[in-house]
């Protein structure tokens, strides 16, 4: 499963079951307001020595409950899109698309956040909030010592998603910075269904 989908499909509302945690309550308020979202995403993958391994420009669209579109524009074109049933991974340079069944239950934390599947957050993470009049920053620290993450940070400015920062235990960091963000606008369902262009190879693992 592509790393980005395993890490970013879910940030929209929280279950009221966790109302006793003020930090989760506040995150709930911010995420609950998102029904659709579009943004330009600047992605940085940073090595343990601080060097930038990769910098990418991405266009993303999100539509609850299951629609997710993630197109890498530069440097290596790639499209990942799901309607909640199937996932298409289209690589123009290879002239191929791989089709898989999509299972949200197998997605990682950020994916679960973006589509509201947050039932295990309070059980698996310590959540702390730092905020002022303009911004809110949530630090999620895994309770399980075997987690691949050291910490996950989610930042908002003026109630809009600004950044997700994944700090892995191997020292690698992934940063998504959201720009030109638009939310709760009309997005067609057809945006989240990929129609393969003629002449490309189709690897359909969903029917195998």
Regions inferred by a protein language model and the residue ranges of each:
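N-terminal mature ectodomain segment of secretory-pathway/periplasmic proteins
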Residues: 26, 31-84
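Short hydrophobic/aromatic-rich beta-strand segments that constitute the beta-sheet cores
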Residues: 39-41, 68-72, 87-90, 99, ...
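N-terminal signal peptide c-region/cleavage motif recognized by signal peptidases
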Residues: 14-15
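Short, solvent-exposed helix-to-loop capping segments enriched in aromatics
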Residues: 31, 106-121
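Gly/Pro-enriched, hydrophobic low-complexity segments
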Residues: 98, 118, 122-125, 131-206
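An acidic-aromatic
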Residues: 59-109, 171-174
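Sec-dependent signal peptide recognition
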Residues: 2-10
């Amino acid at each position: 499963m592509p790393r980005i989908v395993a890490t970013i499909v879910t940030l929209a509302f929280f279950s009221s079951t966790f109302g006793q945690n003020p930090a989760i309550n506040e995150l709930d308020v911010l995420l609950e307001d998102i029904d659709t979202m579009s943004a330009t995403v600047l992605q940085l993958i940073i090595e343990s020595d601080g060097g930038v391994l990769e910098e990418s420009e991405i266009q993303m669209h999100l539509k609850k409950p299951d629609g997710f579109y993630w197109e890498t524009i530069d440097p290596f074109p790639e499209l990942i899109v799901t309607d909640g049933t199937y996932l298409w991974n289209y690589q123009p340079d290879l002239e191929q698309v791989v089709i898989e069944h999509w299972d949200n239950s197998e997605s990682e934390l950020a994916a679960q956040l973006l589509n509201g599947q947050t039932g295990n957050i309070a059980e698996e993470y310590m959540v702390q909030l730092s905020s002022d009049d303009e911004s809110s920053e949530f630090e999620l620290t895994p309770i399980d010592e075997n987690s691949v993450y050291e910490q996950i940070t989610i930042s908002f400015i003026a109630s809009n998603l600004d950044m997700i920062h994944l700090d892995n235990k191997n020292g690698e960091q992934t940063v998504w910075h959201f720009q030109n963000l638009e939310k709760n606008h009309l997005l067609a369902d057809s945006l989240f269904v990929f129609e393969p262009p003629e002449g490309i190879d189709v690897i359909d693992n969903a029917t195998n």
